[in-house]
Regions:
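A short acidic (Asp/Glu
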Residues: 15, 51, 79
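Short, intrinsically disordered low-complexity segments
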Residues: 35-65, 70-72
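C-terminal structural segments of small proteins and small subunits
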Residues: 58-96
Length: 96
């Protein structure tokens, strides 16, 4: 399933900067960055449960915000992209 994760982490103190890096690194491990604080994550149920739990452990609900958009498995026709920064097909072959 495709889940879009967006976040806004307060960086008013050094702990916020650390949380921001940790949230971004966690999202990079499961998806691709499509905007500064927005990731598209193609995950199965077990991966999603683990990712969501980790993100909820990292953020501070008093100062930060996390949003999850569940697009499901039939997401091809639900996402439109225009402009720069073309995205990679997460289901396609990976060339290294």
């Amino acid at each position: 399933m495709l889940v879009v994760v967006s976040y806004d982490v307060s960086t008013k103190d050094t702990a916020g900067g650390r949380r921001l890096r940790q949230v971004a690194q966690t999202c990079v491990s499961c998806g691709q960055r499509v905007q500064n604080s927005v990731f598209e994550c193609l995950v199965d149920n077990a991966q999603w449960t683990k990712l969501k739990l980790r993100l909820l452990q990292l953020f501070d609900p008093a100062t930060d915000s996390l949003r999850f958009y569940y697009l499901g498995s039939n997401f091809k026709h639900r996402v439109e992209h225009h402009g720069a920064k073309a995205t990679v097909d997460l289901r396609g072959p990976l060339l290294i």
